Amino acid sequence: MSATVSTVSADLHKAIDAGDEDKITKITASYGSEQRDKIIPAYHANYGIPPSEAIRKAFKTGFYETMIVHAWTSRFELRAKLIHESIKGKIDVITLLDLVIACMPDDWYGTKVCYTKLYGRELVREIDEVIGVGTPWQSLVSGWVKHDRKYRKSIKSDAEAFRMALDSDNYEVLGSMLATSVPDEWMRIAAAYEETTGMPIDQAIASRYVKVDQTALILAHHWLCDPGQAAAYICSQCCAERKGNYARICRFTSMMYDHCLKCKYAYRAYGSLAMDIRKCFEPKLAKHLLVFWRVE
């Protein structure tokens, strides 16, 4: 961190007091989640209030305020609380998929610890009990949350096994392969699949599955290939809706922009990230999203 924690805390405090959204966004976007987690307690110690609470008091409730509040909440606490919200009552599947699949391994471990502290339940067991079984997305999530990956060293046979599972709608095999593959080996499996079939894996999945099952499997594939690729996929879905999916893009941006800086390049598969953000979201929010995703 180029500036000291106390300096950043002071700069953020001044920006919040002044109601300067542009400055707040610039400061927030300059630091990753691990760095922000060091700034949060310093801010609290200096000003007697967490930055998230200071932001809530300074701004009207809305998507921008929620996005910035999320960004200035401990990453483990935030993910744990959002997962809990997504699985209580009717399951918010898309939100759960984003929170579970698009998560760095170290962040997942920290989230599990925090979840137990907050709710007295073991996170993986809680998810397994709540989501049930019987669909592709359920099978994938059940395996994914265990974070038990290993090298199989059988690229061609794995690519063929995935093809056969797709052709026969064997979603248990599909979910298991995605949930247990090591990222660099998965990229080779995906390349072998495309070489053999002439079709990229994401297109093959899209030809077989729809709605949340399609989203789950394609998101997992992209995440294993590169977090930026997964971010581009999520952003493309947010921008595909006529008015834009405000809640989803704000939530995902606040949590993952620093891990997915290749998003703007991967998004070229769907068009221009900057143009789509401007088209789908109101200007007041769009300008902040552009800063986080490093596009103009």
From Swiss-Prot:
State what this protein does. Giardins are involved in parasite attachment to the intestinal mucosa and in the cytoskeletal disassembly and reassembly that marks the transition from infectious trophozoite to transmissible cyst. They may interact with other cytoskeletal proteins such as microtubules in the microribbons or crossbridges, to maintain the integrity of the ventral disk.
Q: Which PROSITE patterns match?
A: ANNEXIN_2
Q: What broad class describes the main subcellular location of this protein?
A: cytoplasm
- Protein's name in the database: Giardin subunit alpha-4
UniProt record similarity statement: Belongs to the annexin family. Giardin subunit alpha subfamily.
UniProt keyword Protein transport present: no
Question: What highest taxon heads this organism's lineage?
Answer: Eukaryota
Tell me where the Annexin repeats sit in this chain.
3-72, 74-146, 153-223, 226-294
Q: Which InterPro entries match?
A: Alpha_giardin, Annexin_repeat, Annexin_sf
MF term (GO), any: phosphatidylserine binding
Q: Which GO terms describe its cellular component?
A: cytoplasm; microtubule; plasma membrane
Subcellular location field: Cytoplasm, Cytoskeleton
Q: Which UniProt keyword terms apply here? A: Annexin, Cytoplasm, Cytoskeleton, Microtubule, Repeat
